[in-house]
């Protein structure tokens, strides 16, 4: 199988302030989600954490990207981290606060838009990346983390 390396060329900084190169996730299925603490969909954190707990040992990485692109996120990483831990016991990896649209967007989101036509329209937009770093699909904010269609494709990609 050919490895699509472009995805792995990108890097985030973790919410704790450490380097987070995406190449660390090679060979894993990644569910990339732009998150927000003050959104009507914030309760999706619970489903994302369940996915993380259920599938991390099988090869899934849930990667949260807190974003204020839609004006519903705290302004500091400490507040986001505290909110996520206190309300949802989040243990999956999260990046520092990033823009996911507009001129200040993180380079990965620039690549997703230019190469794949993917642009989050709201918080909790989900993008699934396979073990080779290829974009499988993107799912609207209304697709629940534990929805049948998402779980089916995650399980398929973990096996495949």
Task: List each language-model region with its residue ranges.
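N-terminal "domain-start" segment that seeds a small globular fold
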Residues: 1-23, 43
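Conserved helix-turn-beta segment immediately C-terminal to the redox Cys motif
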Residues: 28-29, 38, 43-66, 85-88
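Acidic-and-aromatic substrate-binding clefts and catalytic sites of carbohydrate-active enzymes
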Residues: 39, 70-73, 145
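Alpha-helical elements of Rossmann-like donor-binding domains used by nucleotide-donor carbohydrate transfer enzymes
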Residues: 47-50, 79, 107, 111, ...
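Thiol-based oxidoreductase modules, predominantly thioredoxin-like and allied folds used
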Residues: 59-76, 91-102
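Short, internal strand/loop/helix patches
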Residues: 79-123
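Thiol-/selenol-based redox modules, centered on thioredoxin-like
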Residues: 110, 114-160
């Amino acid at each position: 199988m050919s490895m699509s390396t472009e995805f792995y060329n990108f890097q985030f900084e973790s919410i704790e302030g450490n380097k987070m190169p995406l190449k660390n996730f090679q060979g894993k299925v990644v569910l990339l989600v732009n998150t927000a603490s003050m959104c009507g969909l914030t309760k999706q954190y619970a489903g994302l954490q369940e996915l993380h707990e259920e599938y991390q040992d099988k090869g899934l990485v849930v990667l949260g990207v807190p974003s204020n692109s839609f004006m519903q996120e705290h302004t500091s990483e400490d507040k986001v981290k505290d909110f996520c831990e206190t309300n949802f016991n989040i243990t999956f990896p999260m990046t520092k606060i990033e823009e996911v649209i507009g001129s200040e967007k993180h380079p990965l989101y620039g690549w997703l838009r230019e190469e794949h036509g993917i642009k989050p329209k709201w918080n909790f937009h989900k993008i699934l990346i396979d073990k080779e770093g290829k974009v499988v699909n993107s799912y609207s904010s209304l697709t629940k983390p534990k929805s049948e269609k998402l779980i089916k494709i995650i399980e398929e990609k973990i096996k495949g």
